[in-house]
Amino acid sequence: MSNSLKAMRVARGTSQSLCIALLLLTCCTLSAQNEHARVRNIVLVHGAWADGSGWKGVYDILVKDGFNVSIVQEPETSFQEDVAATKRVLALQDGQCILVGHSYGGAVITEAGTDPSVAGLVYIAAHMPDAGENEADDGKRFPSDLSQSTAIKKTADGFTYLDPAQFREYFAADLSAEQASFMARSQVLNLADNFKAAITAPAWRTKPSWMLVATKDRAINPDLERWYAERAKSHKVEVSGASHAVYVSRPKEVAALIEEAASHAR
C-alpha cells in the first residue's frame, strides 16, 4: 500500500473520530443546557384539614430526581396568613420555582403565585379562583358530594374540620383505613372564612399552569377541576380512580406532573 493511500485512510479515520467527538460534545452540551433550563426548586402547599406531611411520597420522588423541595405549613388561621406563610417560603428559594397547591392550597398559590420567583403553578385536585372569586362560590358551579353531606363540622370559634368518622369516605377513599384514620385525627382545623376569601390578582392569568384532576374526588367535584383547567388553559392530566387525597395515594403521577411543569415553565 502506498504511503499516500495510508495517509488518506489515517486522515479519513481522524476526520470520522473528530465528527463523533463533536457530535457527543454537542449532545452533552444540549443535555446540560436542558438540565440547566429546568426549574430546580419546588414549593408544595397543602390544603384544608391537612398538613405538609401528606407530601412525603411526592417529596421523596422529587428529591431523588434532583429537585430542591420545600413544604409550606400553613396555619389555616386566615387566608392572608396562609398566603404570607407561602410567600415566606418563596423568599427562601435561590432561584425560580414551581409552586404546587392541593385543594384549598390552590387558592393560596393563586394569590401567592404572583411572586416573581414563581415560574409556573401546579394545581393538584385544587381550587383555582379568578379575581374577585372565592372557592366557596366556585364550588357551587359543580357541587361536590362533600358539600352536600354532613361531614363538615364547625367549632364554636368558627373553625371547620371533617368528621373523623366520615373523613375516609369524602377525603381519602383510596387510602387504607389506618392511614385515613391517622390523617383524620391529625387534621389541621381551617378557619371557615378562608373558603370565602376573594382572590385579588390570580397568578394563573400571567403564568403557565397545570391541573391534575382526581376522577373520584368527592371533596371537589372533578368537573369543577376540569372547568378550572379549561378556563385557565392549563395543561391537564386526569388520574383515574383517585380520591381527593391523590397527592398521598398517587405520588408518582403527582410528581410526574410537577416535573413536567419544571421542564416547561420559563
What residue ranges belong to the model's regions?
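Active-site catalytic motif of lipid deacylating hydrolases and related acyltransferases
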Residues: E35-D94
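Bacterial N-terminal signal peptides
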Residues: S15-C27
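Flexible "cap/lid" loop of the alpha/beta hydrolase fold
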Residues: S117-V118, V122-P164, L191-N194
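Catalytic active-site module of serine/aspartate enzymes centered on a nucleophile-bearing elbow/loop
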Residues: H235-R266
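Active-site nucleophile elbow and catalytic-triad environment of alpha/beta-hydrolase enzymes
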Residues: R185-W204
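Conserved loop-alpha-helix segment in the C-terminal half of the alpha/beta-hydrolase fold
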Residues: T215-A242, V248
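Gly/Ala-rich beta-loop-alpha elbow adjacent to hydrolase catalytic centers
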Residues: V100-G105, I109
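Short beta-strand/loop motif that positions the catalytic acidic residue
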Residues: M211-V213
